């Protein structure tokens, strides 16, 4: 999945070992899995060349997507186009 982080979310992620995000719509910090129990445990992370993006490798305690899919990236472009026809 792709999510947003602010400094607080990054700090909480690094200090707890669980993936936290900043919700742009709710304007608040959230712990991934807080409601579903599908927590994301940090295994390692990398920072990009500009130090403005991070990539986390996680162990997932369940599906990541709110649809119940293991990943949010489960649809192909063709499926998306055909579903709108």
Curated annotation (Swiss-Prot):
Q: Which domain of life is it from?
A: Archaea
The alphabetized list of GO BP terms reads: L-histidine biosynthetic process
Fill in the subunit field for this protein. Homodimer.
Where does it localize?
Answer: Cytoplasm
State the reactions this protein catalyses.
1-(5-phospho-beta-D-ribosyl)-5'-AMP + H2O = 1-(5-phospho-beta-D-ribosyl)-5-[(5-phospho-beta-D-ribosylamino)methylideneamino]imidazole-4-carboxamide
| EC number from the UniProt entry | 3.5.4.19
* Cofactor remark from the record: Binds 1 Mg(2+) ion per subunit. Binds 1 zinc ion per subunit.
Gene Ontology cellular-component terms for this entry are: cytoplasm
Q: Which family does it belong to?
A: Belongs to the PRA-CH family.
Q: Which gene encodes it?
A: hisI
Q: Which UniProt keywords apply?
A: Amino-acid biosynthesis, Cytoplasm, Histidine biosynthesis, Hydrolase, Magnesium, Metal-binding, Zinc
- List the PANTHER family hit by this protein, alphabetically: HISTIDINE BIOSYNTHESIS BIFUNCTIONAL PROTEIN (PTHR42945), HISTIDINE BIOSYNTHESIS BIFUNCTIONAL PROTEIN HIS7 (PTHR42945:SF1)
Its required cofactor(s), as named, are:
Mg(2+); Zn(2+)
Q: What is this protein called?
A: Phosphoribosyl-AMP cyclohydrolase
Say where the protein is mainly found: cytoplasm
Which positions does UniProt annotate for Zn(2+) binding? 49, 65, 72
Q: What is the lineage of its organism?
A: Archaea, Thermoproteota, Thermoprotei, Sulfolobales, Sulfolobaceae
- Which amino acids does the record list as binding Mg(2+)? 48, 50, 52
For this chain, one GO molecular function annotation is: phosphoribosyl-AMP cyclohydrolase activity
């Amino acid at each position: 999945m792709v999510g947003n982080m602010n400094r607080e979310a990054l700090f909480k992620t690094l200090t707890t070992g669980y993936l936290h995000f900043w919700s742009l719509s709710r304007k608040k910090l959230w712990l991934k899995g807080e409601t579903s129990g599908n927590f994301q445990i940090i295994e390692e992370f990398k920072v990009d060349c500009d130090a403005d993006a991070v990539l986390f490798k996680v162990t997932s305690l369940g599906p990541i997507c709110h649809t119940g899919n293991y990943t949010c990236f489960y649809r192909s472009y063709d499926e998306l186009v055909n579903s709108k026809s």
